[in-house]
Amino acid sequence: MEFAGIITEYDPFHNGHAAQIAAAKSAGAGCVAVCMSSGAVQRGGVPVLPESVRVCAALDAGADLVITLPAPYACATAEQFASAGVRLLAALGCDTLVFGAEDPDAAQQIGRAHV
């Protein structure tokens, strides 16, 4: 893993998000890019915190780059949200996607299914 990507909203950014960025770095990512929704979130509303605050939080936590997921994709279905994020990160040369899950067992099952 040289270039890790995270597709997210960070609405709001919390310690779990910081741990995710740190885990990507400790796993060998030389660069971590975050593709983040801007002025709209997937639930169709506006974020709790402005984009500038969420970008600063990601950078302060160790992300090297934050790019914006355009609002039409941020407000779309989960599949379209993720697909647009994957395409943007792939265009930058991202070779690994990093994700989290509220249920650790689900994350392990997903990881095993895609090995």
Please state what every model-predicted region is.
Residues 1-114:
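Nucleotidyltransferase catalytic core that binds NTPs
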